[in-house]
From Swiss-Prot:
Protein name: Bifunctional purine biosynthesis protein PurH
Record field: catalytic activity: (6R)-10-formyltetrahydrofolate + 5-amino-1-(5-phospho-beta-D-ribosyl)imidazole-4-carboxamide = 5-formamido-1-(5-phospho-D-ribosyl)imidazole-4-carboxamide + (6S)-5,6,7,8-tetrahydrofolate; IMP + H2O = 5-formamido-1-(5-phospho-D-ribosyl)imidazole-4-carboxamide
Keywords: Hydrolase, Multifunctional enzyme, Purine biosynthesis, Transferase
Domain of life assignment: Bacteria
Source organism per UniProt: Clostridium kluyveri (strain ATCC 8527 / DSM 555 / NBRC 12016 / NCIMB 10680 / K1)
Length: 499
């Protein structure tokens, strides 16, 4: 039996309908501050919490419900005679329902406000009440999610009360919410990349149809705080995004944003299969397509400029899963939308280079992003690369960062003509990339050459310049082979393994 409900919410969505429903069922409503005023202004009879506690709100509203009368009314076990006798002697009435949503710390932590102002959005009274109610869920219904109001109304209307399973689920949602809420506050105050206890605060954005494969279930969660591209994008067209789509989008968007120049990238199975720069998007796309006309089929296209109609028409000639761009011309959008299943993604948020997390069985690995590229290039051969070759080398190394190790990228005219990766030795991806390219000017490697075989193979294909981190005990062998074949080579001192 629900006789008394305490309501204290920041988000007033759906509140009037719920409050009126409870009132019609004969439930006494107790409320605080802004919620009390809101209900009263909308002609819903409500008792202010200070009338129950005999204690006015103080400290600018910081202390409203932190009172034994409130928490005894919530925590008293109805089937415990001693509990009920105690609160009866103290003239404390049981509270049967707690409806609370918290100060929006998740949102405010990223606002352009002072540190002190952000601290004021750390809720204290709300979490205390809902944790108490959740602990005593058999006797007290606790509601923290506006999305549960309709289900709550339905249950009470049809059954006169809320069944155990739903009460338990609502209680579980409290601790689920508090885990994320406290985690966000902890991260805000600590400002540490590697704290003693790692709190990850994410909220479910969508249930996905399946995971990497149809027999795997999956969901998509986004960070509760901060702005990031794979959180703050807009889908303008097409089917629901899949697990694999989102992973591929992430890589594609990171690659294309490595470049200030006009760039296009094609991604397939979480690996770039074509990357190119151009004087305009049309040229960049055509060059990207020519990198690998076979693998681009069914892939993802990303560009770093507003997509124009000419490029959209060219993209529409083949089947791709997704097109992602910072914006779209109106005519370009019309062309792409003719394919009703094509997922069109608008994203204007740059990659964050945030901490990277990998799950292992029983733990997680955390590392900083691989955001270092070339600090000091050292020419180690007799021949020096030309300025054009240096720029192509840097282009190739930027692409290498996103290819699974061992990674080799062959470049000509700012076009990744050959991409080889994911092999357990370095010569196999070298042969694959050179064979794919047919001809190229420069070659980039994500790690050093353990032997001179990569240089020997590159020489057969007329490679003019090579970029690699260096650091092998046999660097001398590779340098000698370059000198023998008139190839210039530079060391960066920066490795880019990707597992």
């Amino acid at each position: 039996m629900i006789n008394r409900a305490l309501i204290s919410v920041y988000n007033k969505e759906g509140l009037l309908e719920l409050a009126q429903f409870l009132k019609n069922k004969g439930v006494e409503l107790i409320s605080t501050g802004g919620t009390y005023k809101y209900l009263e202004q909308n002609d819903i009879q409500v008792t202010e919490v200070s009338k129950i506690t005999g204690f006015d709100e103080i400290l600018d509203g910081r202390v409203k419900t932190l009172h034994p009368v409130i928490h005894s009314g919530i925590l008293a076990k109805r089937d415990n005679k001693e509990h009920m006798d105690t609160i009866a002697k103290k003239d404390i009435l049981p509270i049967d329902m707690v409806v609370v949503n918290l100060y929006p710390f998740f949102d405010k932590v990223d606002d352009n406000i002072t540190f002190e102002e952000k601290v004021e959005f750390i809720d204290i009274g709300g979490p205390t009440m809902i944790r108490a109610a959740a602990k005593n869920f058999k006797d007290v219904i606790v509601v923290t999610d506006v999305g549960d109001y309709s289900k709550l109304i339905e249950e009470i209307d049809s059954k006169g009360d809320v069944p155990y399973d739903f009460r338990k689920k609502l209680a579980g949602k409290v601790f689920n919410l508090m885990s994320a809420y406290d985690g966000a506050i902890s991260n805000f105050l600590l400002e540490e990349d590697y704290p003693e206890y790692l709190s990850l605060s994410y909220k479910k954005m969508d249930n996905l149809r399946y995971g990497e494969n149809p027999h795997q279930s999956a969901a998509y969660y986004t960070a509760t705080a901060g702005t990031a591209p794979m959180k703050d994008f807009t889908q303008l067209n097409g089917k629901q995004l899949s697990y694999n789509n989102i992973k591929d989008m992430d890589i594609a968007w990171k690659v294309v944003n490595e470049f200030e120049e006009i760039c296009c990238v094609a991604v397939k199975h979480n690996t770039p299969c074509g990357v190119a720069l151009g004087k305009d998007l049309y040229e960049a796309y055509v060059k990207t397509y020519e990198c690998d006309p076979t693998s681009i089929f069914g892939g993802i296209i990303a560009v770093n400029r507003k997509l124009d109609v000419k490029t959209a028409e060219e993209i529409s000639k083949i089947f791709v899963e997704i097109v992602i761009a910072p914006d779209f011309d109106e005519e370009a959008l019309k062309v792409l939308m003719e394919k009703k299943n094509l997922r069109i993604i608008k994203c204007s948020v740059k990659p964050t280079n945030s901490m990277e997390i990998a799950k292992v069985d029983g733990g997680i690995l955390v590392q900083s992003a691989d955001d270092k590229l070339v600090e000091n290039m050292e020419v180690v051969t007799d021949k020096k690369p030309s300025k054009e070759e240096i720029n192509n080398l840097i282009f190739g190394m930027k692409v290498c960062k996103y290819v699974k190790s061992n990674a080799i990228v062959v470049v000509k005219d700012f076009m990744a003509k050959g991409i080889g990766g994911g092999q357990v030795n370095r010569i196999w991806p070298t042969c694959h990339a050179l064979d794919r390219a047919g001809d190229g000017v420069v070659l980039a490697s994500d790690a050093f050459f353990p032997f001179n075989d990569v240089v020997c193979e590159a020489a057969k294909y007329g490679i003019k310049a090579i970029i690699q981190p260096g650091g092998s005990v046999r660097d001398k062998d590779s340098i000698e082979e370059c000198n023998k074949n008139g190839i210039s080579m530079v060391f960066t001192g920066v490795r880019h393994f990707k597992h």
